[in-house]
Amino acid sequence: MSEPIIVVRDLANRFGSHAVHEHLDLDVMKGEILGVVGGSGTGKSVLLRSIIGLRQPSEGSVHVFGQNLPALPPLERSKLERRFGVLFQNGALFSSLTVSENICLPLIEHAGLSRADAQFMAKVKISLAGLPPDAGAKYPAELSGGMVKRAALARALALDPDILFLDEPTAGLDPIGAAAFDPV
């Protein structure tokens, strides 16, 4: 059996005296699809942020691909983080950039693609996320909630990540929009 790609041990996250997680252990294997389910405010997003390195846990360790993310030097950490695709709950798109520009940015910055190659790949990712081709020229404010989620998914897929993290990908969508998102 292969080694886990994510290993969380004895994780604790606290906000003041309020404990969100205590002694949490988690292994995620390559190819595994894992859903973390819980009510509002139960720490699902806090766990995600701890795993991807946006939050330093109060206690415990998080290893991704065998590496302790918080302990890595900045250059190595950045290299490891490029292996993640993250769809944040609110989409987290740059409002001053079009959908295509939001997708092109990591391709140019991190993959070193030319603008033309990045634009081509943005079209591929837009299609893959189930958006119409003309969505690329629109700004996030011009999109419906479901389209924002799909645009954010296209950006999360931009660098062909080894791990894809989805934080409440259908939150705020109507039942039809949520059902349409599932096949993507």
Where are each of the predicted segments found?
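The feature captures the beta-strand-to-loop junction immediately N-terminal to the Walker
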Residues: 37-39
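Helix-to-loop junction immediately C-terminal to a conserved catalytic motif
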Residues: 52
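Conserved ABC ATPase "signature" region
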Residues: 67-68, 115-134
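Conserved ABC ATPase signature
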Residues: 139-143, 147
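Conserved catalytic motifs of ABC-family nucleotide-binding domains
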Residues: 160
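Catalytic Walker B motif of ABC-type/P-loop ATPase nucleotide-binding domains
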Residues: 164-167
